[in-house]
């Protein structure tokens, strides 16, 4: 896949203390929220002042709520939009009339049964295949092409090249320091000169992640990248992916069979059934996610029931019946079904 390569400038974060880094990220997010609130207040004051001046001059006033609607339009910043997208393979229709908007900088997780169209959707967004019908748009903040990278379940490292050389694939010698910096970010700088065969499965996936991030992508697509890893390594990779996403603020689109993984990483969970979105569930849980909390278990159960179609009321679930206020309420062990 052809994509513009950006010059990367990474900090020397080795990932040794993920909890401390995530705590720092929460502080940064809080400061950013306060700044956004201040900016909104100033904008509101400006609109009020302009309206008062116009009223004094006898100018026509806009309808009530027009300014709010205009602010809403400006606030909706999408990096990916699909409108009426369809995909067929011969007589088989995989996606039909598919509509989806992904906000810039968000982390969207896609779940569903095998064959529902999850990976097909990802390949369309990646540009590896073309839609049969509809419109698919990807754009950066300036309206130009969106630099996109994809990470698969198989790390796809070249066995005859070193770890560092694999990260530098497609880049010139000038990218050597950038590659070393991103290897430091995934905690593998000391393995830069090793061969892929000398690495564990989790380490190979870290190299694949570094190879994607060295290009400073604006959109990172993850096609079940952790499916072959053991449970502990998956949790470590969840923390790593979340940390790098928070630091670099790329848009992430994850396809997974694991509902637990979707709740752990996503801002939003989409369930695809028969080529359409059957559930669009926000994840109202603080980061980093407390996996042992009642709220986490309740949301996981909510999505899992909908995937399995065993919920007592599917319509209520699809309408977003999960309530974050239930997080602190007591739950009996029999209320929760665990996916094992």
From Swiss-Prot:
Keywords: ATP-binding, Cell inner membrane, Cell membrane, Membrane, Nucleotide-binding, Translocase, Transport. It catalyses: ATP + H2O + aliphatic sulfonate-[sulfonate-binding protein]Side 1 = ADP + phosphate + aliphatic sulfonateSide 2 + [sulfonate-binding protein]Side 1. Residues 80-299 form the ABC transporter domain. It is found in: Cell inner membrane. Its main location: membrane. It comes from the Bacteria. InterPro entries: AAA+_ATPase (IPR003593), ABC_transporter-like_ATP-bd (IPR003439), ABC_transporter-like_CS (IPR017871), ABC_transporter_ATP-bind (IPR050166), P-loop_NTPase (IPR027417). Signal peptide: none annotated. One of its GO terms (cellular component) is plasma membrane. SMART domains: AAA. ATP binds at residues 112-119. Its EC number is 7.6.2.14. Belongs to the ABC transporter superfamily. Aliphatic sulfonates importer (TC 3.A.1.17.2) family. The complex is composed of two ATP-binding proteins (SsuB), two transmembrane proteins (SsuC) and a solute-binding protein (SsuA). This is Aliphatic sulfonates import ATP-binding protein SsuB 1. The gene is ssuB1.
